[in-house]
């Protein structure tokens, strides 16, 4: 209930799922260490005002989408996002994917390689722009992902650990209408809701044209590598990406 403060009373779950809530990161001051502390970081999000009118445009929730959705899950179900995912999704599917990693698994991790430096002078940028506030609220480096606190934390938007097979196993639920083998996790009606367009235009954080449904982006001119159809996709650091084609029952 406290999330409704400071102009957020009309934010719906679909806005969290589609990066349209107006709360695309933490307001300053914030550190990477702050987001490891679930209670502190979700309280910070609850207290701040949105940076644009919710529902009017997308702005990629690069680090905090898992905290926003995860706290909804925790308030309803009582479990943390990582535990809920492990017990309700990864476990039934036999998928080797983890949100918050046990230290015993650290030896299996391939470290993320830092990207090249940006070819721009950061001092010339508008530090009050939504994009800069998002990517600096906070601004973890790739090297931080090599460290124990990051690996063990519950950061649903950014620190899932798995491999190509496990990502495909989880997304196969969407590609196959909510059911894989004997495991049914989603109804056909829920699958259809993924493709309810929530925002289509220049993303306020990425600065690129993006078409968002619920939880995924969908084909648009910003993704010319995709065919048309009921396809959901996204990607991340290190070249990771997933394409979910519901018409061909395929995940790539």
Task: Give the positions of each predicted feature.
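Glycine-rich phosphate/pyrophosphate-binding beta-alpha loops
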Residues: 154-161, 231-243
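Short, surface-exposed loop/helix-turn segments at secondary-structure junctions
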Residues: 224-232
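Short, well-ordered beta-strand elements
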Residues: 242, 249-252
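Short connector loops/turns at beta-strand edges and beta->alpha or beta->beta junctions
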Residues: 50, 247-248
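Hydrophobic beta-strand positions
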Residues: 72, 243-244
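Short, loop-centered acidic/histidine patches that primarily coordinate divalent metals
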Residues: 219-221, 235-237, 245-247
């Amino acid at each position: 209930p406290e999330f409704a403060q400071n102009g957020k009373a009309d934010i719906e779950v679909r806005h969290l799922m589609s990066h349209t809530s107006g709360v695309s990161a933490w307001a300053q001051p914030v550190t990477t260490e702050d987001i490891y502390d679930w209670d502190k970081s979700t309280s910070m999000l609850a207290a701040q005002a949105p940076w644009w009118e919710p529902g009017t445009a997308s702005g990629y929730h690069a680090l905090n989408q898992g905290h926003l959705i995860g706290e909804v899950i925790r308030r309803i179900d009582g479990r943390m996002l990582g535990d809920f995912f492990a017990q309700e999704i990864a476990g039934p599917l036999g998928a080797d994917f983890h949100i918050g990693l046990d230290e015993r698994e650290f030896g299996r991790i391939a470290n993320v390689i830092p990207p090249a430096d940006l070819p721009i002078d950061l001092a010339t940028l508008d530090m009050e722009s939504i994009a800069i506030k998002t990517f600096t609220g906070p601004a973890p480096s790739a090297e931080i992902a090599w460290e124990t606190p990051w690996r063990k934390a519950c950061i649903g938007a950014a620190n899932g650990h798995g491999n190509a097979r496990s990502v495909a196993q989880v997304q196969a639920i969407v590609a196959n209408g909510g059911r894989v083998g004997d495991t049914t996790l989603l109804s056909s009606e829920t699958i259809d809701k993924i493709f309810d367009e929530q925002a289509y235009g220049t993303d306020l954080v990425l600065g690129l044209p993006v078409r968002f449904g619920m939880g995924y982006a969908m084909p648009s001119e910003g993704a010319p590598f995709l065919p048309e159809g009921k396809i959901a996709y996204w990607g991340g650091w290190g070249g990771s990406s997933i394409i979910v084609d519901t018409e061909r029952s395929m995940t790539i």
